[in-house]
């Protein structure tokens, strides 16, 4: 699927990862239908408008709500590819069902249900997570070679234990279930590890990944950072992976997207070296 004549839809287009996907699409000359909560909130979309001025593609904004049925119908019309990135990533929550599970699960249902109604849709690229594959290192003990692969599913997360991982697992399983019930569009899923890297909009840093870096720098972890290995990947590489998933005809199934393993301590040391503050 290499034609750039048809439109593409990006849900949650002003988000951390989604903004990089939109930028890539505009550079390549696509027309992007971008859904956001409020298309009239210029502060949230100004960086995307600046991309449109710089690159050869075009962008059209639509207001949409993950929890409202038919909310994506208008934005999806005449689109051949859907990038469904919109889903909450929060670690500090009070109500996991309302804040995480409902938006992730119902949002997936609503976007995919709209896709079933729109004849132009040929492929959906879903942003999932390695969190849909495992909760923590304890799960690896029961895996062959202690290895997580694209065949691995999270079996331990719940509403009360790692609800974010639970929300990603439920949403992705629902996506595959809906995919198997139809034959008009293909599904490719990207499962990144911890996504880090520059934020495309310097004035709007509302991302859990950015919050983590802030906490490392603002003294939140001054007593000590968690001794925990973690896989990380550059946000720009994840955006490129989404693009390849959409336009590479051989792309199918799930793709773990992770660059290397590190730790919070190593990330802290790297940040320290970049800002030139002595230890």
Stretches with model-predicted labels:
Residues 160-163, 197-206, 221-236:
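Glycine-rich "substrate-gating" loop/helix at the edge of Rossmann-like oxidoreductase active sites
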Residues 213-223, 228-255:
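Alpha-helical substrate-binding/gating segment
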Residues 84, 88, 93-164, 188:
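Conserved Rossmann-fold NAD(P)-dependent oxidoreductase catalytic core, especially the SDR/UDP-sugar
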Residues 239-278:
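Mid/C-terminal beta-alpha module of Rossmann-like enzyme folds, strongest
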Residues 181-185, 197-212, 245-255:
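Glycine/proline-rich active-site loop of Rossmann-fold NAD(P)-dependent oxidoreductases
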Residues 39-106:
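NAD(P)H-binding glycine-rich loop region in Rossmannoid oxidoreductase-like domains
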Residues 158-187:
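Active-site Tyr-X1-5-Lys
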Residues 4-30:
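N-terminal Rossmann NAD(P)H-binding glycine-rich loop of SDR-like oxidoreductase domains
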């Amino acid at each position: 699927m290499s034609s750039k004549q048809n439109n593409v839809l990006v849900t949650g287009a002003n988000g951390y990862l989604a903004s990089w996907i939109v930028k890539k699409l505009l550079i390549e000359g696509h027309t992007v239908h971008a859904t956001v909560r409020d298309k009239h909130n210029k502060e949230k979309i100004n960086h995307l408008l600046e991309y449109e001025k710089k690159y050869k593609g075009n962008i059209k904004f639509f207001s949409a709500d993950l929890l409202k049925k038919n909310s994506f119908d208008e934005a999806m019309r005449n689109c051949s590819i859907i990038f469904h990135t919109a889903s909450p990533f929060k670690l500090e929550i009070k109500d996991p069902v309302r804040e995480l599970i409902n938006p992730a699960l119902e949002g997936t249902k609503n976007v995919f249900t709209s896709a079933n109604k729109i004849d132009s849709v040929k492929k959906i690229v879903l942003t999932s997570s390695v969190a849909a594959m495992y909760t923590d290192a304890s799960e690896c003990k029961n895996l062959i070679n202690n290895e997580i692969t694209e065949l691995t599913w999270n079996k331990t997360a719940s509403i009360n234990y790692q609800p974010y991982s639970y929300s990603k697992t439920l949403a992705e399983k629902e996506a595959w279930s809906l995919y198997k019930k139809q034959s008009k569009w293909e599904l490719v899923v990207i499962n990144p590890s911890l996504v880090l890297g520059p934020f495309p909009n310097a004035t709007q840093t509302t991302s859990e990944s950015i919050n983590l870096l802030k906490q490392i720098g603002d003294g939140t972890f001054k007593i000590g950072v968690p001794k925990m290995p973690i896989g990380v990947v550059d946000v720009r590489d994840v955006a490129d992976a989404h693009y390849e998933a959409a336009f590479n005809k051989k792309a199918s199934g799930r793709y773990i997207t992770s660059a290397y393993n590190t730790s919070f301590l190593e990330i802290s040391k790297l940040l320290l070296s970049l800002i030139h503050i002595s230890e």
